[in-house]
Curated annotation (Swiss-Prot):
Post-translational modification note: Phosphorylation at Ser-46 by ISPK stimulates the dephosphorylation of glycogen synthase and phosphorylase kinase.
GO BP term (any one): glycogen metabolic process
Residue stretches making up the CBM21 domain: 122-230
Lineage per the UniProt record: Eukaryota, Metazoa, Chordata, Craniata, Vertebrata
GO molecular function annotation: glycogen binding; protein phosphatase 1 binding
GO cellular component, one term: membrane
Effect of residue 554 to A: In a breast cancer sample; somatic mutation
Illness: Type 2 diabetes mellitus: A multifactorial disorder of glucose homeostasis caused by a lack of sensitivity to insulin. Affected individuals usually have an obese body habitus and manifestations of a metabolic syndrome characterized by diabetes, insulin resistance, hypertension and hypertriglyceridemia. The disease results in long-term complications that affect the eyes, kidneys, nerves, and blood vessels.
Membrane topology: Single-pass membrane protein
Organism of origin: Homo sapiens
Name this polypeptide is given: Protein phosphatase 1 regulatory subunit 3A
Amino acid sequence: MEPSEVPSQISKDNFLEVPNLSDSLCEDEEVTFQPGFSPQPSRRGSDSSEDIYLDTPSSGTRRVSFADSFGFNLVSVKEFDCWELPSASTTFDLGTDIFHTEEYVLAPLFDLPSSKEDLMQQLQIQKAILESTESLLGSTSIKGIIRVLNVSFEKLVYVRMSLDDWQTHYDILAEYVPNSCDGETDQFSFKIVLVPPYQKDGSKVEFCIRYETSVGTFWSNNNGTNYTFICQKKEQEPEPVKPWKEVPNRQIKGCLKVKSSKEESSVTSEENNFENPKNTDTYIPTIICSHEDKEDLEASNRNVKDVNREHDEHNEKELELMINQHLIRTRSTASRDERNTFSTDPVNFPNKAEGLEKKQIHGEICTDLFQRSLSPSSSAESSVKGDFYCNEKYSSGDDCTHQPSEETTSNMGEIKPSLGDTSSDELVQLHTGSKEVLDDNANPAHGNGTVQIPCPSSDQLMAGNLNKKHEGGAKNIEVKDLGCLRRDFHSDTSACLKESTEEGSSKEDYYGNGKDDEEQRIYLGVNEKQRKNFQTILHDQERKMGNPKISVAGIGASNRDLATLLSEHTAIPTRAITADVSHSPRTNLSWEEAVLTPEHHHLTSEGSALGGITGQVCSSRTGNVLRNDYLFQVEEKSGGINSEDQDNSPQHKQSWNVLESQGKSRENKTNITEHIKGQTDCEDVWGKRDNTRSLKATTEELFTCQETVCCELSSLADHGITEKAEAGTAYIIKTTSESTPESMSAREKAIIAKLPQETARSDRPIEVKETAFDPHEGRNDDSHYTLCQRDTVGVIYDNDFEKESRLGICNVRVDEMEKEETMSMYNPRKTHDREKCGTGNITSVEESSWVITEYQKATSKLDLQLGMLPTDKTVFSENRDLRQVQELSKKTDSDAIVHSAFNSDTNRAPQNSSPFSKHHTEISVSTNEQAIAVENAVTTMASQPISTKSENICNSTREIQGIEKHPYPESKPEEVSRSSGIVTSGSRKERCIGQIFQTEEYSVEKSLGPMILINKPLENMEEARHENEGLVSSGQSLYTSGEKESDSSASTSLPVEESQAQGNESLFSKYTNSKIPYFLLFLIFLITVYHYDLMIGLTFYVLSLSWLSWEEGRQKESVKKK
C-alpha cells in the first residue's frame, strides 16, 4: 500500500474542512482493514472481489465518504490505487469459507418399501403411505410423494411435522399429483424446508401423514416411529476445494496475466494444424497455484514460452519438410499420371481431358491411354477400385507407386487382379510378349518399343479375368486363343496395328488386371460415362498413331463404352472407330459380356447355358477376346476394306469386320473356332445386338443366340412345319431373357405363339417378325431378333413350298440336323464352317438344333425355328413381302444364287484375309458350284436344291451369321472375295426378298464378316427383307441386313443375281432410305442418353422405332395391296 502521507497531502489541498477525527478515520481506514462500523468497508469489501477480476484494468477507483453518514457534513474524498485492493481478498476467502461451513443436508432415518408389492400391501393396511422422498441438493429441503388408497372421491392429505419432539407441530397440505390416479390409488406431493434457525447439526425433523376422507381419517407414521430426518453438516467440503484449486490455475493465469496462456492456445492450434499433439502436449506448462511473485511467474512463463516456441519451430520445420515432400511426390505422380494415363475412373481423375491432352503431347497415349491416374485424395480407395493404375497408386500412406504400362500383357492369364493391393500394384505388371520401353516416368516410350501383343481389349481381359475367376478352363482357353490371335494378329497386322493393339492391350491389361467383377462393373458404368472421353481419345490416338486401328484398340479397351458408342462410332466418321464398331458388335458383346460377366458372370452361365459346352463358354469369353483381337485385325483390314464402306454402313461393316476378324481368329485357332462357334451363335448375334444397342449386349446376344438357333431350327422346323403348313398354323417363337445377362442363356425362354391361319396360309414361308424390347437389356429385342430374323425367313412353308426343295430346311430331317449338331459339336470348326459356308440346310439345321440343344431343347427346335423366323415381330407387310420374296426365290435358282454367293464370297474373301478364304474354301469346298455341291453334300438332303440350302441358310443365316461370323470369317475371306460380285447380286436378291443388300461392297463387307455361303437366296431375301423390316423397327436392320447380305450372298447364284439385280437395287435403295431414319434416330438416341438420361433416351428411342415400324408397315401393306 501507499503510505498514508499521500492522502494526507492531498487532503490539505483537496479535502473539505473536516474535524480532526476525519483524518484519523481516514488513516484508520487505510491502515486497518476497513472497520466494520463504516458503510464504505462493506461496499469496498464486496467490490474488492469484483475489482480483482473486473476493475484491474482501470487505473483507479474513486471512493467518496460523506460527512452526513457520520452526522457531519461532507468530510473528505479519498483515492485508492487498484494495486491496494487485493488485500480485501482475505475477507472474500473468509466469506467463502463461512459459506461452505453453513451447508447442511437432511438425511432420512427410515426405510421405504423396497418393491411395489410391499408398498401396495402396506397401503391396503394403512390406506396412506410415504412412497418416496427426495432431498434437494444444496439446501435443507425435502420433497416427498404420498400414495393413498382411493377409498373416496373427496380426500385431503396433510403432513404433520415437528421440530421439537412434538412439543409443537405444523400441518402442511399435500397437493394432488396430476394424472397420478390409476383407479385404485392416488399420489400427493409435499415439500418441507428447514429454515436457518433450525439448520444446525443434529436437528431432527419428524412428520407423519394424515389422510382425511369421507369414510374417515387415516394415519401413517412409519409403524409408530414417525418419519424422521436429521440435519447434518455437509462433510464434503474438501471435495469442492480440489476442483477449486484446479480451476484457479486458469483463473490465476488470467489474474497474473500469464502471457503463455495465449501462446499455449496458439500452440494447441498449431498442434491441430500440424497433427503433432504428442510433442506439444508434453510442453504444455502447468502453473501451480503458489505465492510466487509476479516476476517469478512471468519468468517461468517466459521460459515455458521459449521452450514451446523452439519446439514448435522445430516441429513446424519437420512438418513443412514432410508436407513439402509429400506434395512433391503427389504432384510428380499426379503430373505423371496426368501426362501418361487417362483416368477411366471418374472418381479418380476428374480432368480426363487433361490426361488426354498430356497423352497427346507426350505421345504416350499408345500404351498409357487407359492407364488411370489417381488423384492424391482418392489414394487407396481409387487404387483399390482400379486394382492397378499403370502409374503409381496412392496407398493409404500416400506412397505412390506407378505401375508402368508394361502391365499391358499379351497373356490374360498373367494378368493379376490387384484390386486389394494398392501398394503392390507395381507387381501387377503384366508380362507382354515384347517388353515396352519405359521412359523416365515409367511410361512406355512411344517410339522406343511397342508391345506387339495383340492383347484383347480391356473387355477381353475382363472376360479373361472372369474366365479365370469363374472358368478355370475358360481362362486357359482365352490365353491360348489370345496367343493364336496374337500370332495371327502379328502376322496380319502392321507395326502400327501392333502399336494400336499395344495400346489396346495396355488398356485391356489395365482393365483386365484391375478388373475384377467389381471393377468391370465400375468400368462398365465409367465407360458409359466416359464414352465421349473414349471417343475423343480414340480420335486423338488415331490422329497421333495415324492408325484407325489404334482407335479401334482404344475402343476395344473401352468396349463397354463402345457398347454404348457402337452406334455412336458407326456414326463417327473415323474408320478405326467404325472398324471397332464393326468388330464391336461381338467384341462389344464380349466386352459387355466381360463387363456384365464380372457383374453377373453371365458369360460363363451364358456360354454354358447356350452351348452347354465350356469350350463354347470359354470361347464366348475367349471369343470375345478373340473378337477383340479380330477387331484389331479387322481394324487393319477394315482400315483398307471398310474405310469406304464404313461411312456408309458402319454397323454392317462392323458386323462384317467382326465376322472377318473372327474368321481369321478361328482360322488361326481351331479351339477358338470351336469356342467361337458357340460364341458366334450367341456372341455374333450379340454383337449385332450390341451394334444396335451397345449398352446391354449380352442379354440381347443371348437372345440372338437363341434366336439364331431358333432360326436354324426354324429351317428344321420348317421341315416339320411345312408338312403342317396346310393346317395353316405358324408358330412365332420369341426368345426372351427374363433377367440378368449372367443367366440369360439359361433363362432364355422360347415363347411359341400360334400364328393365325391367315398368317400361315401363304404358300411361302410366313415370316412374322416380332419387334420386342428387351426390358432387361433396355434395348429393342429387335436388335437380337433381327439377328435371328434371317433365320425366320420361311418358318412356315406350305407342303408345296416344302416340296420346292428350296425350303431345304423343311426337307432336312431332325436326325440329320442332330447329326450335324453332333458333327458341329465334335468338329465345331469344320461343321460350323460347313454349316456357315455351305453345309446347307442340314448345317444350319444342325446349328439350329445344336444351338437349341445347347440353349434349349431339341424338342423345341422346330418351334424355335418357327418362332425364330417370326421372331422379328415386324409382321407389318413382311409376310406379304415374304410371299413376294418366296415367289422371287422360286423364280430364281437357289443353286445359281448359291454359286454367285460363293463366288462373290470367295472373290471378296481374299481382300479380308487368306486364312478366312482358306477355311472358307475348305468349308465351301471351292468355287460357287463346289460350294453348292459341298452344301448339298453336307446337307444330307442332296435332293433338296441349293435353294433349300440357301433357304436353310437364310433361316440359319442369323445363326450361321452369328456362328459364321466366327467360323466363316476364316473361310469367308476367299468366299467373300468370290461373292463380292455374286454376293452383291445375291444380297440384292435377298434384299429384294427383304434385306436388300446395298452394293456388292456392302454385301461383301457383311459377307466377309458373317458370310453364309449356303443361303436360300429367295427365302433368305424374303427373310432378309422381313427381318430388315423388323430390324428397321428395332433399329438393327442395318446390321441384320449385313448378315442377311452375307447369307443371301452365300446362297444366291449368279443367274438369280442377274435376274434379280435390278429388283435388288431398287429394294436396296428403298432399304437404304428406310434405314436412314433409324440411323438418325439412333444418333439422336445416343445424344439424348448423353445429355439427359438413359431411360428418357431409351423411351424416346423405343417410341420412335415403334412409330417408324408402324409407318413402314403401313407403307408396305399399301404397296402389297397395289
